[in-house]
Amino acid sequence: KAAFTGAEIGMLQSIREIPGFLAFTAVFVLLILKEQTFAYLSLAFLGVGVAITGYLPSVIGLYFSTFIMSVGFHYYETVKQSLSLQWFSIDEAPAMLGKLIAASSAASLVAYSFLWLAMDYVGLSYSAIYLVGGSVCLCLTLFMWLAFPRFGSNTPQRKHLLMRKRYWLYYALTFMGGARRQIFTVFAGFLMVEKFGYSVSDIAALFI
């Protein structure tokens, strides 16, 4: 246990958002790698970062593992939407994106349920939980890479940064959504642990 205070939590989240702020650099990576390959590599980074977190219970160690997993997470999030839209036609995209969001929510419920059961009933250690989570991510990434090494695209891929004034509302909502996520999932969680003594299983049950 690293025994973080609010100051360390703030620094940790600042480090976590550095790759998010620099996610636009994905357009330069795509000049070298195919988008699908980039997505697989990003997921591998995410899995490795999660897997090693439990074995680095220090301030510097958690900063390092958080940065690694954040690089994977933010780059994957950057290309995920693009890959999803390339698979579908314009007519079927809204319904299919809704199904993808539903699948993502279902996966979150499975993960939170696993945390709750692992801490309350199984008694797994932090390092074991992180190792299991990271290993599952790596195994699924390897499976997807072997099962789908290359797939076609219904929509031509653009490899340049695109910003348009008429999308300002979308940009604003995305910005506010990020702010909400920081407040709700980061500092609210820290408050529940620090001030109200919530355990890991309590936080997991709350998210469920």
Please place each PLM-identified region on the residue numbering.
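Short amphipathic helix-loop junctions that connect adjacent transmembrane helices
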Residues: 1-8, 186-203
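C-terminal membrane-cytosol helix-exit motif in multi-pass small-molecule transporters
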Residues: 115-116, 134-153
